[in-house]
Structures are given as C-alpha cells and as structure tokens.
Amino acid sequence: MSFLNGTSLTPASFILNGIPGLEDVHLWISFPLCTMYSIAITGNFGLMYLIYCDEALHRPMYVFLALLSFTDVLMCTSTLPNTLFILWFNLKEIDFKACLAQMFFVHTFTGMESGVLMLMALDHCVAICFPLRYATILTNSVIAKAGFLTFLRGVMLVIPSTFLTKRLPYCKGNVIPHTYCDHMSVAKISCGNVRVNAIYGLIVALLIGGFDILCITISYTMILQAVVSLSSADARQKAFSTCTAHFCAIVLTYVPAFFTFFTHHFGGHTIPLHIHIIMANLYLLMPPTMNPIVYGVKTRQVRESVIRFFLKGKDNSHNF
C-alpha cells in the first residue's frame, strides 16, 4: 500500500492506464487523436480570430459561436495533452489533486458546451420568430450574463461531485483504466459505496443535458412553426440553412455524450472497456474538431469572411 498517504485511504497519485487491451498500439492510436486535436486548436482559434477581426461578424449569433469555440478549446485541452503523454511516453502517473482538478474541468467544460448550444438555439429562435425585436432582446449585456450563468451553472453543479469523489476510500489500488480522470472512472476503483456518486452524476446529467435538450427542442419547435408559416420558399430555405450548422453541432456533441454517459452508468458489462475509453476521448474531441469545419462550410457569412481575410492578405502582400 505504498501508494497511500500514510495511514490514509487517499492515494498520493493515480495511474492512468491508457486504453486497456490496446497497450501495444497506443502509439498508433495517438496519431489520429493528435491530428484531431491539432485541427481543433487551429480551427477554433482561427474562427475566434475571424469573428474578432471582421465587423460583419459582430452579431449575437457569432458571439455565441466564438464562445462555443472557446469552450471547445478548453474542453479538449483539459484532457488531450495528458492523454498524448500517456500514449507517447508512458507517463501514466497523475497526482491525486491534479486528477480531481482534471475531473472538475472536464465536466465543467462539457456542461458549458451543452449550455452554449442551448443559448445558440435560443438565439436562432429569437432571430427567426422575433426578427424585429432581435437587437433589443439579445443585447451585449444579455449575452455576457447568459455566458457567465452558463459557466457558473457548470461550476456549481460539478463541485459537489469533486468532493464526493475526494471523500471515497481507495483501498483497492490506484490504477484507473482510462486516459483521463472521469468522475465515475475514478469512483469505480474505490472500495467505498459509490451509489451517491452515481445518483448525483445522473442528477447533474438531467439538470444540464435534460434542461438544455428541452430548451433546444422548444426552440426548434417554435422555429419550425415560424418557418412553415412563411409564404416565400426562398425565405424558408434561408431560415432552415441558418440552423443547419447548429443542428450538426448538436448531433456531434450529444450522440457521443449520451453513448459515454449511458455505457458508464448502465452498460459497463456489455460494452468492451476499450470501446468505452475510445468513445470517451472522441466525445471530447469530435465537437471541437468538427464545429469549425461545419460552421465554415455551412455558414455563408463565415465563408465570405474567410475569403475576405485571404483576399486582404493577398492584397497586402502585393502592396508590399
């Protein structure tokens, strides 16, 4: 029991064992993960820079998009650098407090990601259903408060799960079969009763994911009713195209999230562990990687802004 702090049942550190059963191919698995992370960082920073520089994108919709990009960067950066160190250099040890901190940030940022998608759905709803009041409803003050409350909600709901995990006794060992510190992955190696952790995790998922999905569903129901009532086919097409990128972002976020959540709580014995670990990594990587691409392809204003940016750079180089 050398991994314990004296007589305490709190370990000094944990060992993140990577992807169980696939240790021999850790290096090969790291290449697609590293590629996706590089695309995510480049794409999201590029999108934020574009929105900051182009005055045509200084509208609530794109402010929320910049907030989504910022959240995406934080979400994937909370795990991927450490995961790559595990896969590349076999550096598996993580301090107990660092593990709890990583767990806190992972769940806070994933909760914030869901919240921002919900805010973007409300933004689309106001823009399509109440176009004349759009500018007066979504002021800079309202946007800032909404973003802050979304972050605060994640923090306040995740903090208890961190303390619930910290209180557990770890007498079975300190090896976690995962690439990062996830709430239930850490709790499951405890020799204590983790029922409270599991129930609280389910409550948080319902409070965040359930509430956000309900708001998104109501928003899109109102949008659909408003669009169907439009007399012009072009207007209907324009309204639908406005929501396409956001709908893709919702699918990319919630499908792997639900898979990861339900396999953790209900499918632990039916889903192979290595599949669960891979999906848990893709769950944090897929949205940050694909969101800039989806919004770049599907959103006309973003495409035009990219073209203007490169044309401006080309003109400046010619003048030089």
Swiss-Prot record:
Main localization (coarse): membrane
Keywords: Cell membrane, Disulfide bond, G-protein coupled receptor, Glycoprotein, Membrane, Olfaction, Receptor, Sensory transduction, Transducer, Transmembrane, Transmembrane helix
A GO-annotated cellular component: plasma membrane
PROSITE patterns: G_PROTEIN_RECEP_F1_2
Keyword Nuclease: no
Cellular compartment(s): Cell membrane
Cytoplasmic topological domain residue ranges: 49-56, 123-141, 220-239, 298-320
SUPFAM superfamilies per UniProt: Family A G protein-coupled receptor-like
Glycosylation: residue positions: 5
Membrane topology: Multi-pass membrane protein
Disulfide bonds: 99-191
InterPro entries: GPCR_Rhodpsn_7TM, Olfact_rcpt, OR51/52/56-like
Stretches of the chain found on the membrane's Extracellular side: 1-27, 78-101, 163-198, 261-276
Transmembrane regions listed in the UniProt entry: 28-48, 57-77, 102-122, 142-162, 199-219, 240-260, 277-297
Record bears the keyword Disulfide bond: yes
Domain of life: Eukaryota
GO MF term set: G protein-coupled receptor activity; olfactory receptor activity
Recorded family membership: Belongs to the G-protein coupled receptor 1 family.
Reported function: Odorant receptor.
PANTHER family reported for this sequence: OLFACTORY RECEPTOR 52N1, OLFACTORY RECEPTOR 56B1-RELATED
Protein name (record): Olfactory receptor 52N1
